[in-house]
Amino acid sequence: MIDCRGVSFSYDGVTPALDGIDLNIEDGEFFCILGGNGSGKSTFAKHLNALLQPDAGTVRINGMDASDPELVYDIRSTAGMVFQNPDDQLVATLVEDDVAFGPENLGVPSAQIAQRVREALKGVGLVGFERHETHALSGGQKQRVALAGVLAMEPRVLILDEASSMLDPRGRKGLMKVCRALHDRGMTIVMITHFMEEAAEADRVAVFRAGRVAMLGAPEEILTRADELAQLNLDMPASCCLGRALREKGVPVCAQVREVDMVAEIAQVYAERSGADVAGRPSASDSRVLDHASSAADGMVASEPVIEISHLSHSYSLSARERRRWRKRSTTVGASGKQTLWGNDPNSPWALRDVSLTVRRGEFLGLAGHTGSGKSTLVQHLNGLIRPQEGSVCALGLDLSSKKGAAAVKAKVGVVFQYPERQLFAETVAQDVAFGPRNLGLPQDEVVRRVATSLARVGLDLAAIGDKSPFELSGGQQRRVAFAGVLAMEPEVLVLDEPMAGLDPAARRDFLELIDRLHREGLTVVMVSHSMDDLANCCDRIVVMNEGAVFAEGTPAQVFAHANELKSIGLGVPAAQRMALSLVQAGVPLRCDKLYTVESLADELAGMLLGCADGPLRASRQAGSKMATQEEGC
């Protein structure tokens, strides 16, 4: 289906973005491409539907030469592409018009277009959103509209360029289910991703480095090679990390790339050594969800509130009179209004519904929730970007209902949006970082000091890059400059809306370390994230949003003890916790009141498995340790 031979490409004529790529993707194959930021993945993807032409080499799609201008229309009808950022792809003001755009341009009859639009929206869980305006959707909902628009074209090849990066856990699961169904029907899937769990579902995996194919093979061959992946800024799947940690402790298990296989193997080992039956049993998370009104984070030292939100409601579509009328109606959302695969209520006019919460000085607060749950709307209230319609927001003693308060708070509560590098606009790095302090009317020497200090705080040197255009920098450096521009305002509260979106695992770790350091320096941090692992590792307290309302709050251990409730609203738990709960269901007696990491889970399992029998398992410890030093897989 796709045949690439000696494909090379450069954006500037000097630095190769692709360097002699030889790759063949079979008809009907599920093919995954991994690689660090800047490795050439997206550039390669754009060659597969003739958005870019190679400087050297050939790209053939279903036998068609992608360099032939006469074949571009046919190639783009054959290979549909979903980009990482949906704003780069949406073209219409209404959802149904956007989804219909592709089929209309293919000359599909009107009756068939209507049917395709219905089926595509059903496939991505957006039934009922046909007449919604695309600009009013959340980032994840926009991504699903973009996917529906490509599905409605019925291509033979579906190219996904990190299309899951803005989706919540249920959205990613829904996307994978759609991909598997299309794959089962014979469609060729080319998926670019940073999620190793998605790569584990592919038929084959290629890993890019500096525009070349560094690794190629089945997921079981590629995803278990920890050292090589680390050199490529990638991680093993959590299941492989657990398997490796267990082998290092003497437990002879394989590094399974799929969690379900890892859980089954550990449960089988436990059953063999303990004599217990491997049978399902009730999950430890079947208890009642946290009462968000009374579940303050246990063990946290109380500190003064910096932001207080009381009974906040917001609608993008209702007038004040209509809001009063709606408030008389029940605020509960019936199950019939939800779409079980993706999760939505298309009939609700509320972005926020009666939200009350407090952010305390010095804490690291996480915000979780499905796409469209109101997270971004909520954080835009925290520094006056949106003023309260109903209820109140008080930040650092300022009433944000007033214009004066909303204006004054912007210097004290800094917001970094999704893809913060898109906040850059000035000719030089120094000018961009200086923009905020200058608008505060600060003296020039103070502006210069803040620019240098804020760049240093994010690991950049003013002398080295201050006079450069921010658009000459790498993506990671641009993101750091955007952070510096907010820090130059010297805020007391830093609000981060999905700050790690689109980053490879190594860059993600770097930014998490940066954010953690800023927190330890005294900043109060509020972070929105779809990564349950990031929230578990960083936050003192987590607030969970659902359909515009606070669903639960508590410490990470408290919140993630309720896996079933979180799953019901489109969320999940950290990977290690997910495997631990699956092991409990399989009959392995792990503790249920504990938040596990891969390391702590491996420690507890090793102690249990090595202690439950004196015979074959203990005798195999030496062999298991030896195996751990060899190839990562089995």
Language-model features: locations:
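Helix-to-loop junction immediately C-terminal to a conserved catalytic motif
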Residues: 49, 383
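Catalytic Walker B motif of ABC-type/P-loop ATPase nucleotide-binding domains
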Residues: 158-161, 494-497
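Conserved ABC transporter NBD signature motif
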Residues: 57-67, 75, 391-399, 409
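Conserved catalytic motifs of ABC-family nucleotide-binding domains
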Residues: 154, 490
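The feature captures the beta-strand-to-loop junction immediately N-terminal to the Walker
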Residues: 34-36, 368-370
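Conserved ABC ATPase signature
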Residues: 133-137, 141, 469-473, 477
